[in-house]
Amino acid sequence: FGLENLGLEKTERGNIWVDGQMRTSVPGVYACGDLTGFSLLAHTAVREAEVAVHAVLGKEDCMSYKAVPGVVYTNPEIAGVGDTEETLRKKGIPYRTIKLPMAYSGRFVAENEGVNGMCKLLLAEDDTLLGAHVLGNPASEIITLAGMAIELRLTVSEWKKIIFPHPTVGEIFREAL
């Protein structure tokens, strides 16, 4: 591609530097996806591309990485979004942990007979969600609910106003709170 000839600023890790609108250090040049080095996930690249297109069109938008879900597609699935306990400890951010076995979801039990699972939520002192981690099927399908709560900074009381259909595995988040 000849990117090295454009004089693009790089990060300490050697990735192409971008701002919140996916603009590089060279005017009129935008970057998204793996070469920016943020999450290396297809779903992140799609969102980065949307932000870049919005910037080109003059629409207000900004890339946020605080709620990018990650999924391990095993059986059972593992999914997480937001911070982990380790990252919160390193950042010195106070938090509380709520753990709830997936067996609290009747739908999970019916669809995963004899299988265990766990839902772990990490909450800030202001009752907003900092991170969520799920072990059990369909973790990949329900983790987005937690990501939305993180991105929108929903408090526990706001989260509890949401009506979840019953029975669904996703209502495990509401049960945990």
Give the label of every model feature segment.
Residues 57, 74-84, 89-177:
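Flexible, glycine-rich terminal cap/loop adjacent to redox cofactors
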Residues 9-12, 59-69, 93-98:
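A short alpha-helix-loop-beta-strand transition element characteristic
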Residues 4-6, 11, 18, 37, ...:
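Short, electropositive, low-hydrophobicity segments enriched in small/polar residues
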